[in-house]
Amino acid sequence: MLRPALSFAFAASLALAAHARADDAPASVRYQLGLLSRGPTWTPEKNAHTDSIQAGHMANIVRMAEAGALVAAGPFAGDGQWQGLFVFAPDVDSLESLLAGDPAIASGRLSCTLRTWVAPPGLGEQYRQRKAAVTADGRSPRDSMVTFAWVMLHRGRKYDSRPTPAVEKLVRQHFEYTEKLRADGRLVFAGAIEGTGDLRGVLVMQGDSATVARAANDDPAVRAGRFAPAILRWWTAWGTIPGH
């Protein structure tokens, strides 16, 4: 539950959170978002050693998911600095030990940056229900991968944390715009990043790269320079995003 003493900057940033369904209006929860990037020992080469690390990385993902700690995961397309992400359940403890069990992180091939992501509940729930179902031959359904645009909203060149009337108006316009995106099906999940860092929020969107880029850049808060979007293509298992 959100504390009433939250600062204006954080309370305003919660306008990023778009609900999966307006008639439900679910309360937000505090996920732990782990952004995976190239680590200090990352190399582009693939060999028996890197294959072993990758196999251990995937096995650890399965362990964390089966333990109920991991509710979403998946790689980013391409071969840039950002490699993928983890989303951990709100009530998970000992994240450090979970991440230490990942050979890719322990070896320095990947680095994980943790942020608190305030977003609607239900992430990964449909996937877990589907995996729990058993087919007639006693096997769980195979995973199907789907892709979304992962839009990270960073502080823009004109970001202002002061609660001025102009800022309040811009935050309202931003919220109204994201609600419009949600209503027409382009925005499927979203939430604010807690704290005062550079990353302020994340939008998960449907559509091709050009369509998503236009939608992100048409955000009044982006046009005004409050936010600067960075768009990645994210692969994840079908059912991770509620309704998708």
Predicted regions: what is each one?
Residues 5-17:
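Bacterial N-terminal signal peptides
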Residues 23-244:
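Conserved, structured core segments of small domains
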Residues 1-2:
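N-terminal secretory signal peptides that target proteins for export/translocation
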